[in-house]
Structure formats: structure tokens, C-alpha cells
């Protein structure tokens, strides 16, 4: 009976949520209903695998935000593979630039409570605590940033404190506004809320801000930067154990799943790999 009551309560709550979002969409308060895939078995909108950025896309992204607030964040994602919470908690006392082989140590994590930043000295897993070598481009970027910084944080807000959730969203908006993704805004006209659509054209300047050029014809997420880093490690033939360590994966299964998708997602490479394996097999049988 208790179990039946719990199931009934879950269904009631689920239906309540679906009704709220359905009404919000019908009232044109939101554009998409995130609960349409919500079922009694759980789950939500099916997640699509985000592809790693190509070298060209990474270069275009960095060129588009050169000198802007998200630049250092993006560099740390692309060339150190840090998670968002690791980047926003990173302090200069964990970045070692004056050594023969510059590196950084991941020892803190960021999250927010009621939009206020909280920096934790305890990481979720032991694997998250790691030392990451810095490629020359990232080391140079951090040296320049540190020389002009008055904060103990590598990616701080204007006051030198860690970012709140809202401040991070604002930081990321510098990237979103430079994409050609279709976007919407609302205005009240004759007392009515009217939806307007903006369709950016690649290479053109934004009508509202001449400093903004629509230079990105692809979307980017913070996690995609990290995925690009891991993908590049694998394409550079870094062994799975080292990839696991640098990525901070607690489970080797996570690393191997990514490794398999990346390594064998190219038919030509798979054919060569299998051909080599069968050649060795034939030689052993001869």
C-alpha cells in the first residue's frame, strides 16, 4: 500500500509539473516544453552526444573572444580539460608557472547556493584531484593573465571574487551572442506581448552592437571544451590510463567509453586497426 501511495504521489507531481510547463508554453512564456519526454520511468529530453570541436572551430572560437571575459575560461577547458566547477574554483596558488614544466593542480570545486558561489576544498572523488601539465599556449595565456590580475582567482568577477551562477551565464553569453543561432525576444506592442525572431548572418555585425560580429556557425557548451581536450589526447595516442588520470575520471569505464567512440569513430582507422590485428593473427597461425 505504501509503495502504491508513493507511485501515486510521483505521478501526481509529474503531472503537475507537466501541466505547469504545458500552460507556460501555451501562454508563450517559454518556447519549449522540457517535460514532454517525462514518463513514469523517469528520464527527460534525450541527450545528444556533443561532438568535440575541430581544430578550425577551436581557433575560430578563440579568435572570436580574444580579449573578452570568457577567453581564459575557454583556454582552460580546451587545453587543460577542466570541468566548469574546477575552472571557476581555480586559484593562482594552484597554478605553477615558474617551473621547468608548468602545471596546475585541481584541488577545489565551485558550486552555487541561491546564486551565491561556494568554493569547496573537498572534491567529489579522489580522481578529481590531479596535476595537469600546461601546453605552451596555455602557460603563456596564464602568465599574461596573472600579471594583470589583482584576484586570487584565475577567472574572477569584477570584484575579484568567484563568479555567481548568474555571472557565469553572463560570461558565457559573450560566446552565445557571437553565434548564428536563431534567437527570440519579446516586446510589448499596444499592450500585447509580441515575440520577435532574430536570425543572425555569419560575418555580419549585430544590429544592436557593432562590436559583436556573428563569427560562429556552431554552438559550444562548457563541457564540450573538456570533451575536445579528451578527444585530442586520444587522437594524439595518449594511453587510456593517462587519459583517465588527466580527465579526472573515477571510473575507467567512462574513459574507455569515450576512448572507443573517439578512436573507432573513423571507418578508415578501424579498417587499418582490424587489418593489422588479422595480419598478426595470420602470422601467428602460420
Predicted regions and their residues:
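C-terminal flanking helix
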Residues: 18-21, 25, 263, 267
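Basic, Lys/Arg- and aromatic-enriched nucleic-acid-binding interface segment
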Residues: 26, 30-90, 100, 127-129, ...
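Conserved hydrophobic/aromatic pocket- or pore-lining residues that grip, position, or stack substrates
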Residues: 17-20, 38, 61, 76, ...
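Catalytic-site neighborhood detector that most strongly recognizes the C-terminal catalytic loop/helix
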Residues: 44, 52, 139, 247-272
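Single conserved hydrophobic/aromatic residue that forms the stacking wall/gate
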Residues: 1-8, 13
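Short, basic (Lys/Arg/His-rich) helix/loop patches that form interaction surfaces
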Residues: 63-67, 80, 132, 147-162, ...
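Conserved tyrosine-mediated DNA breakage-rejoining catalytic core shared by Y-recombinases
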Residues: 39-42, 90-145
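C-terminal secondary-structure termini that scaffold catalytic or DNA-interacting sites
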Residues: 99-100, 114-129, 136-138, 159, ...
Amino acid at each position: 500500500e505504501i509503495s502504491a501511495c508513493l507511485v501515486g504521489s510521483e505521478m501526481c507531481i509529474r503531472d503537475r509539473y507537466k501541466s505547469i510547463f504545458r500552460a507556460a508554453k501555451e501562454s508563450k512564456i517559454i518556447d519549449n516544453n522540457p517535460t514532454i519526454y517525462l514518463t513514469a520511468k523517469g528520464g527527460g529530453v534525450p541527450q545528444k552526444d556533443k561532438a568535440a570541436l575541430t581544430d578550425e572551430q577551436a581557433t575560430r572560437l578563440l579568435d572570436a573572444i580574444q580579449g573578452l571575459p570568457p577567453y581564459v575560461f575557454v583556454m582552460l577547458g580546451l587545453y587543460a580539460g577542466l570541468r566548469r566547477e574546477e575552472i571557476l574554483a581555480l586559484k593562482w596558488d594552484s597554478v605553477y608557472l615558474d617551473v621547468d614544466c608548468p602545471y596546475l593542480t585541481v584541488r577545489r570545486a565551485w558550486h552555487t547556493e541561491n546564486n551565491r558561489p561556494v568554493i569547496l576544498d573537498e572534491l567529489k572523488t579522489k580522481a578529481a584531484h590531479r596535476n595537469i601539465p600546461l601546453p605552451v599556449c596555455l602557460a603563456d595565456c596564464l602568465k599574461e593573465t596573472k600579471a594583470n590580475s589583482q584576484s586570487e582567482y584565475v577567472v574572477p568577477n569584477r570584484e575579484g571574487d568567484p563568479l555567481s551562477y548568474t555571472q557565469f551565464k553572463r560570461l558565457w553569453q559573450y560566446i552565445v551572442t557571437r553565434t548564428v543561432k536563431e534567437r527570440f525576444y519579446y516586446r510589448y506592442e499596444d499592450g500585447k506581448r509580441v515575440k520577435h525572431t532574430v536570425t543572425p548572418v555569419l560575418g555580419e555585425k549585430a544590429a544592436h552592437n557593432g562590436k559583436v560580429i556573428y563569427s560562429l556557425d556552431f554552438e559550444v557548451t562548457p563541457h564540450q571544451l573538456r570533451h575536445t581536450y579528451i578527444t585530442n589526447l586520444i587522437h594524439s595516442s595518449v594511453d587510456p590510463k593517462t587519459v583517465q588520470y588527466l580527465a579526472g575520471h573515477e571510473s575507467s569505464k567512462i574513459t574507455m567509453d569515450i576512448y572507443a567512440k573517439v578512436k573507432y569513430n573513423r571507418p578508415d582507422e578501424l579498417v587499418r586497426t582490424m587489418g593489422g590485428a588479422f595480419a598478426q593473427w595470420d602470422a601467428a597461425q602460420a
